[in-house]
Amino acid sequence: MDVELEEEEERICLRTAEEGQLANMDDDKLVSDEVHLRQLSATPSSAFSLQHSRGSDTKEEAPPEGGTMGGKSAAPREEGEPDERVVLRRAVDKGAIALAQIDDLKLEGDDDDEAVVNGEEVDGLGLSNPAAQTTDDEQITVNGTGAAATSSVAADAASSEQDAASTAMATPDMSKIPRLPGDGAQMEDNGSGDLPPSLRASTTSILSNLRKKQQGGPLRGGVAKQTPLRVQSVRIVEAKRAYGPKRRTESCSIFGNSNFEHDLESGNSLASIPGQSQRPLNNEMYSAFKSGNVVKGILCPSLTNSFKQSSLERSYLTYTHRQRQKSLIIVNVVDFVLKIVLAFVWIMRRSELGPIESDDGTSMATAITWSVCCGIANMAICFLGYWRCFANNYLHWAAVCTWVLFNIQGFVGQGVGFADREYLVWYILFVIFVPYAMLPLPLKWCVVGGTITASCHLAVITIIKLQHGEATINPECVLFQIFANFILYTAINVAGMYTKYLTDRGQRLAFIETHKAMEHKKESEKELQRTQKLLDSILPNIVNNQIRSEMYKGTDPTVETQFNKLYVYPMDNVSILFADIKGFTELASKTSAQQLVKILNDLFARFDRIAEDNHCLRVKLLGDCYYCVSQFESDNWKTRPDHAVCSVETGLHMIKAIKDVRLHTHVDLNMRIGIHSGSVMCGVLGNKKWHFDVWSNDVIIANHMESGGIPGRVHISEATLKCLNDAYEVEPGNGGCRDNHLKMLNVKTYLIKRTEPLRPKRRFGTRSSAHLAGSVATAAPPCATPTALPKSISASGSGSIGGVTATGNDGASIDGRSLEYAATIAVPAQQPTQLLQQQQKKNISLNSLPNVVEGVAMDSRRIRNGCGVMGGAGGTGGGGTGPCGMSTVSSPTAMMSAPLEVQLRPRNGACSIQNLAEAIDGKGLIIEDESTTDWIPEIPFKNLNSPEDGLNRADSILVDTKEDHRVSVAVLDEEIDEFIEQNIQINSNKEIRREYLNPWTLKFKDKSQEQKFCQLREDMFRSNMLCVFVIWIFMVLCQVIIIPRCTRLIICLSVGTVILTFCCVLVMAEEFPGLPRCLKTNSAKLVHQRQRRTLFICGVIVSMCMLSAIGLVLCPSSTYIGTADEHSRFLRMVSPYSNISMTEKEFKLNVYLSATIHHNITISTPASGGPTPLVDITSSGPSDEFVRSTLNALTLNLTPPLPQSHRPYTLTTNGHSVSLSNLSYSDASVMQSSSDVEGQCAHPEYLVFTWVLCLVSLATALKLYYLVKALMALAMVAFYTTLIMMKFGSGDSFSLVELSRLGMPLGVQMLILLISFLVMVCYHARLVEVTSRLDFIWKEQAERELTNMKSNRALNDTLIKNILPDHVATYYLSDEHTDELYSKMHNLCGVMFASIPNFQDFYSEDIDNGKACIRILNEIICDFDELLEEPRFASVEKIKTVGATYMAAAGLNHEHLRLRGETSEDSVCDLVEFAFAMKQKLEEINGDAFNNFQLRVGICSGPLVSGVIGARKPVYDIWGNTVNVASRMDSTGENWRVQVPENTAELLCSRGYTCVKRGEIAVKGKGMMTTFYVHPKGISESQLISPVRMPAGIPLAQTPNLQRQTSHHGSFSAVVFGMLQASKRSTAIAGTPTGTPSPQIRRGHRGSTFSSVRLSQKSTTVNPVRRNTTRVRGRSYRQKKSSSNNSIVTQASSSYMPSFRRIDQIETTISKSHNDAL
């Protein structure tokens, strides 16, 4: 289990099981809802959503399977709980409860025995949960943790532990599975946080019932419940079927649980309650990290603060580094300004104290040079950081350079104005803090850098102290100073590390949302691409684009209108080709189902390639019939001028391809090809199973051209012959002798003499780019001697090329039509584009050729040996990669009569023809015709999940799908990382900030978004306060060490420590159940309420600020600096030997005891060589001589940072000034002044260092609003500045002067330090604020992208289910069989062909090119499609429509029949009932529109084969003798009758149907067959009415109109419309609420294009509006509720009258044209 849990933590799937659970039928709806309910109930968050109220007369039952949800045992309530909410809160952490335990909960107010839940009656099924009564996931509120509040106290401890142990292994802990935003686990997007009434419960009543349950007493109303039978059946079925297709699980990432819950008492979403937001921190939220646990709400820091997934870690580092681009620049700017300020102070001090001696020029030049170089380095790093390219890839190295530069400055200290190394403690604090707060470096790097800086500086100070003997004279003071430095460095490191850790951890959690947003966006785009691929595979691009453009700017097609939208478009001057396989029935009888589908897929895939290469477009597959139409340009709907040639070439290639199949299968197969040219209407009809189709009289003629054709020959009409322009030799076809329709229309037909294609297909290879790159990677051999082409190559494909004979595949000539090439091929390698230029000069148009490759592939990198060759053989027109490596293409000209010569002229190093022939092989870029190459047929839907265009041949051939599946996970991760690289750019962050945030306040411009952000729960608040408390402890230690023996200070610090300890306890009180209730209540308020939290943090920081500075006021000056009394004592030691009256103002030593620059001088004598008290050497001489002798003997033994000496010093005494010239001073040693003799340390600057820690503690409050932080920091620095000016600048307190002219006053130095940290803290606050708000935006986008992804996935599923039956769609969506052909053998199925035979008589192209008539057909087919939505026809599947023929089948899904308890015979009966319903529906249409359409139905039952064929245009089809017989039953049937063969009639008679024998009839291909007419059940032969009086099969009494029902899959137009809305959402502005616009009710006026009136001489004045009443009855609910509905209908009716009068006026003419046609 541990291994499984670890693996689960590594990758947590994005897609949950709830996403695809929608039942197909109404009977399955409860099953789906129950399973969805059970899955949601598997998390403790759904406890309150699953409270069932039961009656008192039921019995208790055992918990269902998997009753203990989450696998955790329930625990009894502990004693002494002071608050009921505490019990619930504690239950959250204890585990989940069983469903049965939830069922036993009796809600408050359930005193009676009625099954009522908060006023709502339980339905008859016993399901009171609204989640079981709806399929809307958004209505099912999932409570993250609050719902689990009752789990730990629900049952006895022992029993629950046993239950948990028994189910833990079988039932996974669903509570640990993260809930994605928007899938029902979060209510943030719902707009209202209120739960449904039946989901609300009283906490008091729940707890009281739980206590009763725990104590063993029965609950009120007592008794347990009996599960309803239907629910039991649901649970039985649940284990037997899979609900919804399996989805891909590769797009997985590592996400923590969702952070949304609901209030336990009110049931409201915490996101909607002010001050309440996400759930508290727990370890589950950090399962994606390598380490770092949460203990009592405190994040335990860890140096390995990284993701477990390396790719995710790399993406995050890139993400966070780019966010700190500006901070890197700010740090270097601050350091640069700091150098300028130090230099300015140094210049000011020099101007005050006088010029420096000339011998210091070299040292000063070094200092200036050092400062200038460091400043240049700062500016260089700034420019690199500003450079976008560098910042996007190498920003962290610029940060490392910054850190190195700062350390060099701190340890060398050679800059102008810099003090000695041991006095640069303030700068080292700055250097340690900067990487944590500002630099874009990982946490581990920051810790290592801070530790190195601190350790090195401590070592430097210690070494310097030891070298100069200061540790010997006063070891205690040196030790205190070193220890104080250690505390300061440790405090800065700890504060910086923990702040960086908390900031980084918060950013990582937000980055997960960011990564999720990007992943969802990528998935959404993939889903949309897959949907578009599927749509492109169904419809041609031109029709697809036209439909999309109309839908994109149109209204929602799902809104009911009076007429269905018609997507039909006219096309003129096209050629239609029909091809039928002769001998297919024999082939089907000799092969298995899998073999037959494989053969058909191979054959039709070849036909698709042939059609595409010859610029033809496949229309549809009709069993073994294939028909296509010549293509047209997608931009202007213009057809090709050579459309007839393209169609003939397609037919000839098909005949050639069938020969190969005949050789392999040993079956007499052949092709009958019929071609006719004319105009068509192209588009789609109906609402279900859209298929591209064409309609016109010319299409019918083309169909009969195929029927009247000859196998193995291309049969063309006279219209086609006129379009060929004598390109082919023909002979009379006499098609009228073989087809009556052609004879009736007097169509002259011809046969193409050629049996081989005029243009043998020669095309590019289909290898992938990787394979091609590998094949060309090898260098070509050296070019041989030049060889010319001595003679031309004929169009037959044979010819001699330099002694090498090149023979085409067909070997036949082109009947005198020579295609001889005269193009010069030898081209210099330096100018490969001349190849194309030469062809253009000779008027060779690559785009105008029917079977030529699309372009010329040239790559200069592949040119070898400075030569390039382009060769073409005869009419084969192809391309190849010569030995020189240049990829070339040639093709035959479209102008047949233009002779071209091909010559290879020698040139410098030109390749030989032999090398050219070697280059053009099976591995090259040229592939011969199908018969000479091994071609792998494409698999349908193989490219469904491919990341690139599925129509690209390189994607569908020579691709190892298994290998692709193995690397799919890694590829997906790389794609997401690359996607993040492209989207999370520096400029992207800047654009988002400008778009969403106010540039000054950083608040969201959208107030609702700002309010939502302010309601976020601050889970790091406790960790922040703990860090503040630790910093305070360090501050106390530092002040106690530096300021000893100050009782008042110690008391104040102790009181402050107690106060801060109480504050920490208050913050942590919510995690400790034993604390008083008031503490826990206030603790919860601090976490949830932003305003309280802000005031609390401000109070704590202000307290720390005041307490840290109070020592400067309360403590005597003697505790931290030498005072006047100390100087007087020192002078009184000298007074016995001098008559000078010494006072503190008379003796002013020009020695400034600054802790960081020049103070604490050691006095040594040359004789002793060691430190000697000054009193021992001042016992002789008068005052002037005493001063001179004393100070001349004074030597300073330490090395200065700047090698300067002989600095003038002045000693003033009794009005006399003595110049001291030969003096040196120490660089950084902290030594004793006159007070050091008594062992006292003077380090006032360490007080300021503790003040810096206060500023750092302010930075640790991460979620404090940045303006509040900035104002507090400014106030603190102003307060500290006042203290510095008052104390450090007072002459009374500090009667000291500067030691040297280069020295800096302590007050100025401390001000620089405070200002530097002020800038860092303020910018860090702004950085954290910007980052948190950007992360919040990304999180919102993640939720929107998830919604879009789910919508796109639903569209994709619906789309594929409109292409395929549900069970076949499930097969392909499972992603387990995408490399296999789908085929299945069915023993018994029903097949129906229902046609409207008189529609052809009705059809006329006189009005709008026949579009008006097609509109009527569309209405009829849409009504037929609506019948399929009825539950009684669940087993009936629409296959396709062909013209006015509707094809359907029943019994194809055996599993569905088994679940419904039906047999295959029942499905055949359902199909018959469907035929009767179609007849009734057509009668209604006739009655409404005053038409007389008639229906003719043929049904046959028996075995058949189903499968999916066609890789580029996959279609589901059925084959077999049953299908053929059903088609013949239709074509030989009678109007208004259902004709069946004998075996089907026997089956139907056994099921109660009346079958009347028709007799034996002649059936094409079957001979004589006995057929029957089927009548509805319950009608005997004696009751049948004569067919003369009423058509057979029409019910005597009309049943009520069938209302239009909502489709479970949705109409196809609704799918496309939804896809377009998804694309709109994907291009919408991020951050704004996205969603499908509310559809507008389209009340279109039926004007001149209205075609729903029978075009006959019958008057239309009675009811001019066709089907007005039925359409009004079928309106949507919104239209029914419209108050102006009646007026709209009346107005519409009156407005349509003129149009119908116009139609009436041309009725006579149309009727005459119809009669003439007959």
UniProtKB/Swiss-Prot annotation:
Reactions catalysed according to its record: ATP = 3',5'-cyclic AMP + diphosphate
Binding-site list for ATP: 580-585, 622-624, 672, 1440, 1517-1519, 1524-1528, 1564
Biased composition (Polar residues): 41-53, 1648-1659, 1682-1693
EC number(s) stated in the UniProt entry for this protein: 4.6.1.1
Tissue expression profile of the protein: Expressed in labella, particularly in sugar-sensitive gustatory receptor neurons (GRNs).
Biased composition (Low complexity): 153-168
GO CC term, one of those recorded: plasma membrane
Biased composition regions of type Basic residues, renumbered to the chain: 1668-1681
Biological-process GO terms, alphabetical: adenylate cyclase-activating G protein-coupled receptor signaling pathway; cAMP biosynthetic process; circadian rhythm; detection of chemical stimulus involved in sensory perception of sweet taste; intracellular signal transduction; response to caffeine; response to sucrose; response to trehalose
Cofactor: Mg(2+); Mn(2+)
Family: Belongs to the adenylyl cyclase class-4/guanylyl cyclase family.
The protein, known as: Adenylyl cyclase 78C
